[in-house]
Amino acid sequence: MSHAIEIESLRYRAGSFELKDVSLHVPAGSIYGFLGPNGSGKTTTMRLVLGLLRPLGGRISVLGDRMPEEAPSILARVGYVPEQPHLDATLTVREIVTFQAAFYPTWDRPVAEDLLRRFELDDGKLFARLSKGQKAKLMILLALAQRGELLVLDEPTDGLDPVVRRDILTALLEYVSERKATIFISSHLVHELERFCDWVAVMDDGRVVTEVPMEKLKQGTKRLVVSGAPTTIGATPFVVLSREQSNGAERWIVGQWEPEMKSYFEGVGASLVDVIDLDLEDGFVELLRSFRERR
């Protein structure tokens, strides 16, 4: 499997915050969700991927080239939407689009014009007078019209209404389908990523908690009702996130569950009474809680 982004043992520190041995592997052509609470290190990691910050150690490869050593050639092929857009407030939408186009030989004017119409952006309006949703649409337009191989999107739909989110996500999905591009998108909202991501990484307090295919995270997080389990258990074929007593039985929250793992309980003299699906948000909360308890 080729990767659009490879991060190995990345370290970074700013004040009291630290990224600790972060490793990520973003498959080429995927929509890769980067999930975590606010302040967990998602934005810092993305800025390191783009060469906007310098790491203390580790290795970053983007589109096959080393970052930051090959930053100019990488950034020519990457579209970026920051969490907070920083554009000249005194320019109109049209002036911003024209200015941006001058920096990218691959700029696709028909795409830009099509998105101006689809997003219903008034090209004579000052950036300062755009609503939050209009600013978000403009930033997505600028990223897509660059025709990059990789889009790095930092909380692009945070705080937007459902209609604007739908418009943006539809445009992104069409872009990936047409261009076979890769999207690396962050959010602190589980449901934002659940619907369309192929892969997901979860970050908390500067560490990667897990990195798995989205379907595996969705299908592999379960609540098990268990009877007769020993107090101390050894290695398990799944990840035990929590164990709690409830009405004479135990309720286990587990990750990386597969149906054939039921036989494990017979081997330890226990009975598996029930397997209950968890929605992704519940699984995410349990994953973070377990990670924090183990620190």
Regions from the PLM with identified roles:
Residues 17, 69-72, 110-113, 215, ...:
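Generic alpha-helical secondary structure signal
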Residues 169-257:
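ABC transporter nucleotide-binding domain
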